[in-house]
Swiss-Prot record:
A nucleoside 3',5'-cyclic phosphate binds at residues 477-600. It comes from the Eukaryota. The chain crosses the membrane at residues 86-106, 120-140, 175-195, 209-229, 248-268, 372-392. Coiled coil: none annotated. It comes from Arabidopsis thaliana (Mouse-ear cress). One of its GO terms (molecular function) is cGMP binding. Residues 1-85, 141-174, 230-247, 393-706 are cytoplasmic. This is Probable cyclic nucleotide-gated ion channel 3. Pfam families: Ion_trans (PF00520). The keyword Membrane applies.
Length: 706
C-alpha cells in the first residue's frame, strides 16, 4: 500500500529530474499497455460474433458423437446377428473354463496334506476374466438394442422401439440379473483375495468356497444360453451354416458335459479324502486339522493317514469300519489327485466322465454316502438325456446332407412304379431314366424356378441377369442389343435340359418357343413339306438358336403360332435358355429397339430358315447360269457348223468330206452333253424353280429404326 501512494506523490514532483525520468518510462509503458488492451478488447468483441457459431458447431459435434455412441441397434441387423452367434459360442466355451477352478486343490504327496496349485489358479483367473469381458460387452449391447413392441407386431415386422428408457427397463426386468450373476468375478475374488487373507487353512477354504461359487454361477450361465439360442434362431433362422458344423456343436456339448462331470468327480474325490483324514485325526490325540492342510508348522501325516485311510477297492471291503470311497476310489488309486501335471489329470477325469456318461452310470458302484448317490443319479439321468439329444441331433444334421439324394431316390422309385403301371415300352423308360439322371447331374435336385419365384422381383431380376447375361452375349444376335433389352430377355428366360436324341420341335408342328443353345450339339433338318427330292440339314452348336419367332412377334397382326418348317433333334446333351412366344411378343411390343433394321438383318444372317432359302436360291441361280452357259456353247458350235457348211458349198469334194466328219462329231458330242445334263437335272434338281422354298416372311413396319 506504500508504493501506490509514493507513485502518486512522485508524479506531481517535476523538479527531480532523475526520479522523473524513472517515473515517466513506466507511464509510457502503461499507456502502451492500455492501448494494446483496447485493441485486444476490440478484436475480442469482433471475435464474439463468430464465437456462438463455433460453440454451436462444437455442441453439434459432441451431440453427433453421443448419438453415435448411444445409437440404438436393430435386433435384425446383420452385425448384431453375427455378434449373437459369436457370443453364443463363447458362452458355451465359457462353461468349459469354470471347471478349471476345481483342479486347483491337490494332495501334496510329500506330506499327505491338501494344497493349492498357484500356477493353475492364475491361468483359470485369466481365462475367466477374458470371458467375462465379452459378457460385459454383451450387456452393453443389450442396453442399446431396440425391440419390437408387441402391439405393432400384428402385420410385418412391427415397429422398432428406440427409446433408451424403455430398452433399459425391458432389459432390467428380463435377463439383467442373470447376466449380472454370470459375470460377477466371485471365483477370482475367492482365489486371489479371500483365501490368502483367511486365518483358517487356505486349501480348506478354497475347496469349500469354489465348490459352491462355481455351482451357483454355473446355473445362470446355463440358463442364459437357451434364450440366446432362441434369439439367434429367431433372427437368422439357424446357428450353424452347415450340417457338419451343427453335428460338431452337438458333439462338443456332449464332451463339455463329460468335462464338467469329470472335474466334479476330481473335486469330490479330494473332499472324500479330506473327510477320511478328519475322521482319522479326530480319533488321534494331539492331532490338529492344520496338519492336514500343509500348514508351515505342520508335521508329516503319512505315518497315521496311510493306516487310517487305506485305498481299498469297494468290492473288497468287508469291514464297515473301513472308509468306503465308492466311485472316487479310482481317482485316489490312479494318483491324479496328487499330480500337478494338469494335462494328465484333465484327460483322465475327462475320460472318466465320458465313459460313465455314455454308459449311463451303470458301472458306478457307490457307497452309502448320500452325496455320492445323488451324484451318480445325476450322471445317469444326464447321460440318458444328453445321449438321446446327441443321437437325435446328429442324425438330423447328417440326414440333412443327404436329403436331396433321398428325394431323388423316392422320385425314381415313383417313376419306376408309374412306368410299370402304365406299361411303357423299354425305349421310353430308358429315355425317362436318362433325362432324370441328366437333370440331377445339372441341378443336384434343386428346383431353380420354384426357388426364384419365391424371391422379390428386383432380386430375381438381378439373379437372372447374373446367370444369363454372359451366356446370352455369346449368341451373336444378342451382342447388338442394348442392356435394357437384354435385361427384359433375361427376366423371361427359362433354363431347359434335353437328353441325347430328343426332339425339340418337329416339322409341321406349331412353334411355341425359341431355344438359345448354351451347350451341346443339335441337327436341324427339313424336307420342305415332305416333297420328293428335297432335303436340307444344318448343325447347330453353342451360340445358335432355333425356333424363328421374331418375325411372328414383330407382326402386330399375328395371332396363331407359326408352323415349323424344320425338325430339330439333339445329338448330345443340350442345355439352353427357352423364351416362350408370349414373352417374346411382350418384349417386341414393349421395346421398339427390337424393330431396328440392324437386328433384323442380323436375324436373317443367323436364321436357319433364311440360310436354307439363301442356299436354295443360290443353287437355283447357279443352275440357271449353267444352262445358259451350255446353251451359249451350243449356239457357238451351231454357228461354227453353219459356217463350215457354207464353206463346203463353195469348196470341192475334199472339203465336203471334212465338213461331214466335223458335223458328225459335233452332233454326237452335243447329243451326249444334252443327255448327260438332262439325266443330272432330272435326278439331282428336278424342277428346281418350282421346288425353291418360300422366302421367309419379313414384315416391314412403317416406323422402323435405323
Amino acid at each position: 500500500m506504500m508504493n501506490p501512494q509514493r507513485n502518486k506523490f512522485v508524479r506531481f514532483n517535476g523538479n527531480d529530474d532523475e526520479f522523473s525520468t524513472k517515473t515517466t518510462r513506466p507511464s509510457v509503458s502503461s499507456v502502451m499497455k492500455t492501448v494494446r488492451r483496447s485493441f485486444e478488447k476490440g478484436s475480442e468483441k469482433i471475435r464474439t460474433f463468430k464465437r456462438p457459431l463455433s460453440v454451436h458447431s462444437n455442441k453439434n459435434k459432441e451431440n453427433n458423437k453421443k448419438k453415435k455412441i448411444l445409437r440404438v441397434m436393430n435386433p435384425n441387423d446383420s452385425y448384431l446377428q453375427s455378434w449373437n452367434k459369436i457370443f453364443l459360442l463363447l458362452s458355451v466355451v465359457a462353461l468349459a473354463f469354470d471347471p478349471l477352478f476345481f483342479y486347483i486343490p491337490y494332495v501334496k504327496p510329500e506330506r499327505f496334506c491338501l494344497n493349492l496349485d498357484k500356477k493353475l489358479q492364475t491361468i483359470a483367473c485369466v481365462f475367466r476374466t477374458f470371458i467375462d469381458a465379452f459378457y460385459v460387452v454383451h450387456m452393453l449391447f443389450q442396453f442399446h438394442t431396440g425391440f419390437i413392441t408387441p402391439s405393432s407386431s400384428g402385420f410385418g415386422r412391427g415397429e422398432l422401439n428406440e427409446k433408451h428408457k424403455d430398452i433399459a427397463l425391458r432389459y432390467l426386468g428380463s435377463y439383467f440379473l442373470i447376466d449380472l450373476l454370470s459375470i460377477l468375478p466371485i471365483p477370482q475374488v475367492v482365489v486371489l483375495a479371500i483365501v490368502p487373507r483367511m486365518r483358517r487353512p487356505a486349501s480348506l477354504v478354497a475347496k469349500e468356497l469354489l465348490k459352491w461359487v462355481i455351482f451357483c454361477q454355473y446355473v445362470p450361465r446355463i440358463a442364459r444360453i437357451y434364450p440366446l439360442f432362441k434369439e439367434v434362431t429367431r433372427t437368422s433362422g439357424l446357428v450353424t451354416e452347415t450340417a457338419w458344423a451343427g453335428a460338431a456343436l452337438n458333439l462338443f456339448l456332449y464332451m463339455l458335459a463329460s468335462h464338467v462331470f469329470g472335474s466334479f468327480w476330481y473335486l469330490i474325490s479330494i473332499e472324500r479324502k479330506d473327510r477320511c483324514w478328519r475322521e482319522a485325526c479326530a480319533k488321534i490325540q494331539n492331532c490338529t486339522h492344520a496338519y492336514l492342510y500343509c500348514s508351515p508348522t505342520g508335521e508329516d501325516n503319512r505315518l497315521f493317514l496311510n493306516g487310517s485311510c487305506p485305498l481299498i477297492d469297494p468290492e473288497e471291503i468287508t469291514n464297515s469300519t473301513v472308509f468306503n470311497f465308492g466311485i472316487f476310489a479310482d481317482a485316489l488309486q490312479s494318483g491324479v489327485v496328487e499330480s500337478r501335471d494338469f494335462p494328465k489329470k484333465f484327460f483322465y477325469c475327462f475320460w472318466w466322465g465320458l465313459r460313465n456318461l455314455s454308459a449311463l452310470g451303470q458301472n458306478l458302484k457307490t457307497s452309502a454316502f448320500e452325496g455320492e448317490i445323488i451324484f451318480a443319479i445325476v450322471i445317469c439321468i444326464s447321460g440318458l438325456v444328453l445321449f438321446a439329444l446327441l443321437i437325435g441331433n446328429m442324425q438330423k444334421y447328417l440326414q440333412s446332407t443327404t436329403v436331396r439324394v433321398e428325394e431323388m431316390r423316392v422320385k425314381r422309385r415313383d417313376a419306376e412304379q408309374w412306368m410299370s403301371h402304365r406299361m411303357l415300352p423299354d425305349d421310353l423308360r430308358k429315355r425317362i431314366r436318362k433325362y432324370e439322371q441328366y437333370k440331377w447331374q445339372e441341378t443336384k435336385g434343386v428346383e431353380e424356378e420354384a426357388l426364384l419365384s419365391s424371391l422379390p422381383k428386383d432380386l430375381r431380376k438381378d439373379i437372372k441377369r447374373h446367370l444369363c447375361l454372359k451366356l446370352l452375349k455369346k449368341v451373336p444376335w444378342f451382342q447388338a442389343m442394348d442392356d435394357r433389352l437384354l435385361d427384359a430377355l433375361c427376366a423371361r428366360l427359362k433354363t431347359v435340359l434335353y437328353t441325347e436324341k430328343s426332339y425339340i420341335v418337329r416339322e409341321g408342328e406349331p412353334v411355341e418357343d425359341m431355344l438359345f443353345i448354351m451347350r451341346g450339339n443339335l441337327i436341324s433338318t427339313t424336307t420342305y413339306g415332305g416333297r420328293t427330292g428335297f432335303f436340307n440339314s444344318v448343325d447347330l452348336v453353342a451360340g445358335d438358336f432355333c425356333g424363328d419367332l421374331l418375325t411372328w412377334a414383330l407382326d402386330p397382326l399375328s395371332s396363331q403360332f407359326p408352323i415349323s418348317s424344320r425338325t430339330v433333334q439333339a445329338l448330345t446333351e443340350v442345355e439352353g435358355f427357352l423364351l416362350s412366344a408370349d414373352d417374346l411378343k411382350f418384349v417386341a411390343t414393349q421395346y421398339r429397339r427390337l424393330h431396328s433394321k440392324q437386328l433384323r438383318h442380323m436375324f436373317r444372317f443367323y436364321s436357319v430358315q433364311w440360310q436354307t432359302w439363301a442356299a436354295c436360291f443360290i443353287q437355283a441361280a447357279w443352275k440357271r447360269h449353267c444352262r445358259r452357259k451350255l446353251s451359249k456353247a451350243l449356239r457357238e458350235e451351231e454357228g461354227k457348223l453353219h459356217n463350215t457348211l457354207q464353206n463346203d458349198d463353195s469348196g470341192g469334194n475334199k472339203l465336203n468330206l471334212g465338213a461331214a466328219i466335223y458335223a458328225s462329231r459335233f452332233a454326237s458330242h452335243a447329243l451326249r452333253n444334252l443327255r448327260a445334263n438332262a439325266a443330272a437335272r432330272n435326278s439331282r434338281f428336278p424342277h428346281m424353280l418350282t421346288l425353291l422354298p418360300q422366302k421367309p416372311a419379313d414384315p416391314e413396319f412403317p416406323m422402323d429404326e435405323t
